[in-house]
A protein has these predicted regions:
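Walker A/P-loop
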Residues: 50-70
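Inter-lobe coupling linker of SF2 helicases/translocases
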Residues: 123, 130, 134-153, 168-183, ...
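Conserved Walker A/P-loop ATP-binding site and its immediately adjacent core
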Residues: 79-100
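Conserved RecA-like helicase motor-core motifs
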Residues: 104-114, 212-216
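Walker B catalytic acidic pair
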Residues: 58, 159-160
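Walker A/P-loop NTP-binding motif
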Residues: 45-46, 64-78
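Charged, low-complexity
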Residues: 1-53, 131-133, 138-139, 154-155
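Conserved helicase ATPase motor motifs in RecA-like P-loop NTPase domains
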Residues: 184-197
């Protein structure tokens, strides 16, 4: 009898610990997690306290899985309205993966779906008791936010974020999304945070917090012209987390490619 009571107390404390732990969402994933994905998750939930993070693992290491883990954590923490901005070609893939791997229902919104079901969509977005995970293209993201400007978005995920790196001197879609999502916690995903120049990093980090590097002029003076790469690396640590394939070779198998000539 006493033994059963101790087991019940242990089970109660264990459940209470898991309920209060940020790691309980790791148990909800319908997948086998790799160590680097858990490390990325830990880095992300810490960074969300100060605005967000860029997860920049190399291709094939599961950034979408990492994003799903973080999304689960954010929802467990009380978030209700989540916007996922991504290339239009990836919307369906994300919808399927969120459902199959995390049991999360999402909706793809574009101009057509909004115009033809405006009342129902508006009702769902305005209902703060209901979770809404919205998948939409880069181009439509800003239009959606403007259309429902009274909606408070709790979290923003940007996939293939390098496409928006030229936020201050590129396409309007990057600048529009930057202006409209200021202050919203963000998760940026990209395998190539640095494509053409160091200023790519300035643009991406500015999405998280423009105060980190200041203006592009200041960034150029310190890092492009000054060449202080060690200081740049240190300042990136809290906002950029990257895993390379060579770091995970012990527990992940990659297919070998043969060049035929």
């Amino acid at each position: 009898m006493e033994s059963n009571l101790l087991l019940e107390q242990y089970s109660w404390y264990k459940k209470r610990y898991l309920d209060e732990s940020p790691f309980k969402c790791l148990l909800n994933a319908n997948i086998e997690l790799n160590p680097h994905q858990i490390n990325a998750f830990c880095a992300a939930i810490q960074a969300l306290k100060t605005g967000g993070i860029i997860l920049a693992d190399e291709v094939g290491l599961g950034k979408t899985i990492e994003a799903g883990l973080v999304l689960n954590y954010v929802l467990d923490s009380g978030a209700k309205k989540v916007l996922i901005s991504l290339p239009a070609t990836l919307r369906k893939q994300w919808e399927i993966e969120l459902l199959e791997k995390f049991g999360l229902h999402s909706v793809i919104l574009d101009r057509y779906t909004v115009e033809h079901d405006i009342s129902n969509i508006q009702h769902q977005l305005e209902n703060r008791e209901k979770v809404s995970i919205v998948l939409t293209s880069y181009d439509y993201s800003s239009k959606l936010i403007r259309r429902f400007r009274h909606i408070k978005w709790d979290f923003l995920i940007i996939d293939e974020a390098h496409n928006l790196r030229n936020v201050f001197h590129g396409t309007k879609r990057a600048k529009n999304l930057y202006d409209l999502t200021h202050g919203i916690p963000k998760l940026l995903l990209t395998a190539t945070p640095l494509q053409n120049a160091l200023t790519d990093l300035h643009g991406l980090v500015s999405f998280i917090d423009p105060r980190i590097f200041g203006s592009e002029k200041v960034f150029n003076r310190r890092f492009v012209e000054g060449g202080d790469y060690e200081e740049l690396k240190q300042e990136l640590l809290p906002v950029l987390y990257r895993t390379l394939r060579r770091d995970v070779g012990k527990y992940m198998a990659f297919s070998k490619r043969t060049c035929i000539t």
